[in-house]
């Protein structure tokens, strides 16, 4: 759930939020056992790292100019998290140990040719995400204690938590074990590729275009 939203980022991750503001970016409509989206790098930031995101590493192969100004996040349910940066891939694996404990393993992947460069230095990215991981783990531990309390009433999802709801629906569907899959919010009727051609420079127009595609998808069933 923590990975699936950035509503907590301004307060918990001020360093991250300065590079990719929590209220910018888009979800990627999806079906199946995954959910994802992207956030734009702002200002002169080139990646997620210390020193305001500056670095001298080349892009990963296949990156476009558009890709190089985005951080893309994908959750492959139930426990694989992929964070694609212009210059490296970060992977989290979450291993449940008990109802109240998990082991989180974080790995970074860089192109072998990049690691051979004379000026290769990954300490900025490693240091940034070590800091961010620890910030997340701390608040997750606090939340775990809070939700275990009988005094805590269930809360509502905000408009910035559609991906959290999608994850929770997946878990609920598995517990129900009736073979049915609950539709996911505004993106329930769209599949990957359905947003091709939408201009995200005008957010209002983009939302209207997505709504039109969603309505057309629902009407065609």
Q: What feature does the model see in each segment?
A:
Residues 1-221:
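C-terminal catalytic domain of Rieske-type non-heme iron oxygenases
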């Amino acid at each position: 759930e923590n990975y699936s939203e950035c509503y907590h980022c301004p307060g918990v991750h001020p360093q991250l939020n300065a590079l990719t503001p929590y209220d910018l970016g888009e979800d990627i409509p999806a079906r199946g056992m995954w959910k994802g989206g992207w956030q734009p790098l702002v200002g002169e930031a080139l990646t997620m790292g210390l020193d305001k995101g500056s670095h001298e590493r080349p892009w990963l192969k296949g990156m476009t100019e558009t890709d190089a100004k985005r951080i893309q996040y994908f959750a492959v349910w139930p426990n694989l998290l992929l964070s694609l940066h212009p210059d490296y891939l970060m992977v989290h694996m979450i291993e449940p140990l008990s109802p109240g404990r998990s082991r989180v393993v974080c790995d970074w992947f860089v192109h072998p040719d990049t690691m051979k460069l004379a000026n290769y230095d990954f300490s900025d990215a490693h240091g940034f995400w070590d800091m961010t991981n620890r910030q997340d783990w701390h608040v997750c531990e606090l939340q775990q204690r809070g939700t275990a309390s009988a005094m805590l009433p269930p809360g509502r999802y905000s408009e910035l938590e559609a991906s959290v709801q999608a994850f929770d629906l997946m878990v609920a569907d598995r517990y129900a074990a009736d073979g049915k899959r609950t539709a996911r919010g505004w993106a329930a009727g769209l599949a990957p590729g359905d947003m091709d051609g939408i201009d995200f420079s005008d957010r209002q127009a983009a939302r209207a275009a997505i709504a039109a595609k969603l309505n057309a998808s629902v009407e065609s069933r």
